[in-house]
Amino acid sequence: MAPKAVLVGPPGAGKSTIGRRLAQALDLPLFDTDVAVEEEAGRTIAEIFVQEGEPAFRALEEEIVRKAIESHEGIVSLGGGSILSERTRELLKGHTVIYLEISVAEGLKRTGTNTARPLLAGGDPRQKYTELMRKRRPLYRQVASIRIRTDGRSPARVVQQLVAKLAE
């Protein structure tokens, strides 16, 4: 068993929204790893970060991603930082991985000052998002077999393009 596609990208790129719509368009189930992490922990991601720290969160996330990649047959939406794990990047090899690309400006517009996103909380949001992208963009590109920009595009348009690409 393997997922039809795995979505990756930074906060605000549309992984959850596009994931839901893509799964619906393809009549497949969606597995959102952020939702699964929260269900497994019984807490929000922000609470895990505060109470246990990022390393504990990443360990739990890595295990949930592994299970999803190994057993889910639909669409898998990964948390934005999941690609920081070398183990996760290895697991993604050979799978259809869709990188939802977004500019820093658009990402900031979409995420705003969302405190549910612990890595963007506090300080200068533009600086934090820019630094996050500097570190992660090469990793997203490394794992991606399909790249699609989501800036200025409706979710419906992005899904339409992805359905066509997945049919190729």
From Swiss-Prot:
Pfam families, per the entry: SKI
Organism expressing this protein natively: Rhodococcus jostii (strain RHA1)
Protein's name in the database: Shikimate kinase
Enzyme Commission code: 2.7.1.71
Gene3D superfamilies (UniProt xref): P-loop containing nucleotide triphosphate hydrolases (3.40.50.300)
Pathway: Metabolic intermediate biosynthesis; chorismate biosynthesis; chorismate from D-erythrose 4-phosphate and phosphoenolpyruvate: step 5/7
InterPro entries noted in UniProt: P-loop_NTPase, Shikimate/glucono_kinase, Shikimate_kinase/TSH1, Shikimate_kinase_CS
Major subcellular location class: cytoplasm
Function noted in UniProt: Catalyzes the specific phosphorylation of the 3-hydroxyl group of shikimic acid using ATP as a cosubstrate.
GO BP terms, alphabetized: amino acid biosynthetic process; aromatic amino acid family biosynthetic process; chorismate biosynthetic process
Binding locations of substrate: 34, 58, 80, 136
Family statement drawn from the similarity comment of this UniProt entry: Belongs to the shikimate kinase family.
UniProt-annotated location(s): Cytoplasm
Cofactor: Mg(2+)
Gene name of the encoded protein: aroK
GO CC terms in record: cytosol
Cofactor binding annotation: Binds 1 Mg(2+) ion per subunit.
Residue numbers binding ATP: 12-17, 117, 153
